[in-house]
Amino acid sequence: MALRGVAGRVSAGVPPAHLASAAVEPPSGLQHRLVHGDQEAVVTEVGATLRAYTVGGRPAILGFDVTEHATHARGQLLLPWPGRVGNGRYRWQGVDYQLPLDEEELTNAIHGLVRWSNWTAETPSANRVVMRYRLHPRDGYPFCLDLVASFELADAGLRATLSGTNLSGVPAPFGAGVHPYLAVDGERVDGWRLAVPAETRLRTDSRMLPIGRAPVAGTEFDFREPRVIGSTQLDTAYTDLVCDPDGLTRVSLEAPDGRRLVLWTDSGCPWLVLFSADPLPSDERRRGLAVEPMTCPPDAFRSGEDLIALQPGETATLSWGIDVTGFRP
């Protein structure tokens, strides 16, 4: 359900004080509310962003208010690349390209080109919405992509897909990712129990660019067996993921009271980035854990590692979701 005010567009659940000023456009545009049983989610026009997700009225993600815009990539889609591109420069099929540097302090391009674009909703229903955006050629990325994101609430939780189709006449470099922050309670991540089935992590330099791989065994980054996060600061890319028998990789997060969230992803995402939200403002610092499924590692436009050469007419798709079965009382 997409909600509009008398002279503007507002979200479901907006307090009456905001409704009185309905002419004020939400910074994230039209709000698409999904409902299924005790679950509610909001996907925004700007960026096809997952702004909110609650179960029984309790937040399952660290989202943001309808009066705000997404900061620190909260709930955003990362296309046509996730993570950073060092100096914003890359070479593709013998041609050098320069991307906009939107992480100026580290001189990087970061998290793609569509986070602030207006996406169009197609055939929305009570519990599902499909968002579409046509990425046209531009300086630094002269390729045309048809991008589609679906969000659906089901009994077990949120199910989502993300795909890109190359509408250009030449191969296009392509990667994809998503950036939800899980939140199992209103406290800091320090007391949460985390399990990440990954054997390897990326080491990074001072600009957060990869400089090599390292085994997680015996380090503070080893969460192959569930353990409390404690004071560990995470801004870490993991790979060599271990799948369950059904082919899915699952990251679990459990609060001290036993409530548990599980983020799952399919084999289309051989990478996960975990980020403990340390740079966020003091009232939000470490109150959510970003678990980011990605088709390729950071800086893949330069390294080529797991970068998809999307052929003309070809589609690449990833699936992911949040299982809330253990989140209810």
Positions of PLM-derived features:
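Acidic, contiguous internal or C-terminal segments within carbohydrate-active enzymes
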Residues: Y133-D185
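Acidic/His-leaning functional-site neighborhoods
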Residues: Q39, N108-E122, R193, P226-S303
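Short Pro-Gly-centered flexible turn/kink motifs
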Residues: Y90-Q98, L162, A309-G326
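Active-site/ligand-binding surface loops and adjacent short beta/alpha elements
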Residues: R4-R9, G13-H18, L99, Y181-S267
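Extended, loop-rich substrate-binding clefts of extracytoplasmic carbohydrate-active enzymes
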Residues: R9, L101-D155
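Short, Gly/Pro- and small/polar-rich lid/capping loops
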Residues: A2-G37
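Acidic-aromatic substrate-binding/catalytic surfaces of carbohydrate-active enzymes
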Residues: E40-Q98, D102
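A short, structured loop/turn motif at beta-sheet edges
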Residues: R91-V95, A121-V129, E152-G157, G186, ...
